[in-house]
């Protein structure tokens, strides 16, 4: 990926000497339920180009490479790792869910008026009722 237009959900891809037009990229969901995880500059992607015209291509996925290896090495682990050090991971063998953000970050869980906020300074619970057992 050479460039990202996040507002239009399009990327330009450098394929050898060719810089493509702005191309759409695939996502997991794009209907009433939607996901967003845009490809970034420097990311290696796979293009499907009907008729071989790269300017009509669609980015259908990304590939690991030496600069950006897989973030896990087990089929039991589903893991997303961000460049700032944040990690979201589920290990189905251990039944363990982990969410980690770097120092200075915040984790917020909300359901209606109830909220849990976690920062370096502590944990704040806000709710109509709090039961401690």
Positions of the model-derived regions?
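Conserved, well-structured core segments that form or line functional sites
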Residues: 87-89, 94-99, 106-108, 115
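Exposed beta-strand/loop interface patches that mediate assembly or binding
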Residues: 1-95
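Intrinsic-disorder/coil detector with helix-boundary
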Residues: 102-133
């Amino acid at each position: 990926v050479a460039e990202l237009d996040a507002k239009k959900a399009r990327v330009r891809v450098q394929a050898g000497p060719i810089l493509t037009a702005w191309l759409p990229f695939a996502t997991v969901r794009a209907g009433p339920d939607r996901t967003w995880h845009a490809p970034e500059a420097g990311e290696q992607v796979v293009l499907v180009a009907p008729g071989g015209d790269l300017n009509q291509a669609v980015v259908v996925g990304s590939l690991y490479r030496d600069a950006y290896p897989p973030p896990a090495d087990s089929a039991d682990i589903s893991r997303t790792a961000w460049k700032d050090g944040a990690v979201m991971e589920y290990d189905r063998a251990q039944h363990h869910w982990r969410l980690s953000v770097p120092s200075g970050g915040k984790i917020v869980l909300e359901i209606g008026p109830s909220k849990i906020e976690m920062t370096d300074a502590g944990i704040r619970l806000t709710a109509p009722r709090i039961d401690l057992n």
